[in-house]
Regions:
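Gly/Pro-enriched, hydrophobic low-complexity segments
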Residues: 154-266
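Bacterial N-terminal signal peptides that target proteins for export
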Residues: 1-10
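C-terminal low-complexity, charged extensions that often adopt amphipathic alpha-helices
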Residues: 128-160, 278
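C-terminal motif of bacterial Sec signal peptides marking the signal peptidase cleavage site
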Residues: 16-20
C-alpha cells in the first residue's frame, strides 16, 4: 500500500506537469451563441471562471496506472492564486504521508513515509519535457479557468486571442497563436461554463484531457466538484480523478512548506526510473 501511494503522488504531479494533448473534433464556425456575440460569449466565460483568489477542499484522489485498476486515497487540495498549489495525501486517520507543492519557482514533492523529497525548478522541467511549462497553466487547470500561454489572469482585452467554433458537445474556444502547441477549451452554452481544457503538441499521439463536472456554488460563481484527467497515447494509459467536497475560499493556512533537514533529497530522474519500471 505504501508503494502504491507513493506511485500515485509522483504520477499525478508528473502528469500535471507534463500535460499535453491534441484534438481531432469536427468544428463549425459560428457567429452567435445563445443570443450573444462571440466576443460577449468569451467575455462571459472569462468572467464566470475568474475572481477566486483561493481554494480549499477535501479531496478523494483516484488514480489508475496502466489500466491496473483504480486506487483511491483521501487528502486535501489547497490553492492560493499566484502563489501555490498544494496536494496533501492523508489516507489513514488524517495523517499526512505525502505532499506535493507547486509554486512559480517549481515543484516540491515530500515523501514523509520514507523521509525524502524532490525539488525541481520549472527551468529544469522545461528542459526535461522540451515544453514551455509554467505555473499559471497548471493553476488555471486546477481552478477551471481559461488561460493563454505565458500570461496570468485574462481580461476582456484577451478575447481576440480566441477563435470561437461549435461542435456537438458545446462551444470550443481555440487559441489562435499556439506555435508548437495548440490550446482548446470546450465550454457549455448558455451557462458559459468551462467543461474541458486541452493542450496539444502537433504530430504526436499523446493526449491529456482535463474535464470538469458536478458544478457547485462557490462564492457567487460555479466551481466543479469533480475533475477527471486522462493521459493517453503512451504505452500505459493513466487516469486520475479529483472528487472535491467542503469547498471554500479559506486562506488561513501556511503557503509554503519547510522541509526537515532530516529528509533526504533525491533526484527527479530516480523517481522517473522507478515509475517506468511499474
Amino acid at each position: 500500500m505504501t508503494k502504491r501511494i507513493n506511485s500515485i503522488v509522483w504520477t499525478v504531479v508528473l502528469v500535471c506537469v507534463f500535460a499535453s494533448c491534441s484534438s481531432t473534433k469536427s468544428l463549425k464556425k459560428v457567429h452567435s451563441i445563445e443570443g450573444m456575440t462571440e466576443t460577449e460569449y468569451v467575455e462571459t466565460v472569462i468572467a464566470n471562471a475568474g475572481g477566486r483568489d483561493a481554494l480549499t477542499a477535501k479531496m478523494t484522489l483516484s488514480v489508475d496506472l496502466g489500466g491496473k485498476g483504480a486506487t483511491k486515497v483521501n487528502g486535501t487540495l489547497r490553492i492560493k492564486k499566484g502563489e501555490v498549489i498544494q496536494m496533501s495525501i492523508a489516507p489513514l486517520l488524517g495523517i499526512e504521508v505525502a505532499r506535493a507543492e507547486i509554486s512559480p519557482d517549481g515543484v516540491l514533492v515530500i515523501d514523509r513515509m520514507n523521509k525524502r523529497y524532490v525539488r525541481v525548478s520549472f527551468a529544469e522541467l522545461k528542459d526535461l519535457a522540451n515544453a514551455d511549462l509554467d505555473f499559471h497553466t497548471l493553476q488555471a487547470l486546477f481552478l477551471n479557468e481559461l488561460f493563454l500561454p505565458g500570461k496570468g489572469d485574462l481580461t476582456p482585452r484577451d478575447v481576440s486571442a480566441f477563435k470561437v467554433e461549435t461542435e456537438s458537445e458545446g462551444v470550443a474556444l481555440d487559441v489562435k497563436k499556439g506555435k508548437r502547441f495548440t490550446y482548446q477549451f470546450l465550454t457549455q452554452a448558455p451557462e458559459a461554463l468551462l467543461k474541458e481544457s486541452c493542450i496539444g503538441l502537433s504530430g504526436t499521439p499523446y493526449l491529456l484531457r482535463w474535464k470538469y463536472d458536478a458544478f457547485r456554488t462557490l462564492g457567487q460563481k460555479q466551481f466543479p466538484a469533480d475533475m477527471r484527467v486522462s493521459f493517453e497515447g503512451g504505452k500505459k494509459p493513466v487516469k486520475a480523478s479529483f472528487a472535491l467536497s467542503r469547498l471554500s475560499m479559506n486562506t488561513n493556512w501556511e503557503t509554503h512548506t519547510e522541509v526537515s533537514n532530516k529528509y533526504e533529497k533525491v533526484e527527479l530522474g530516480d523517481i522517473l526510473k522507478q515509475l517506468l519500471k511499474k
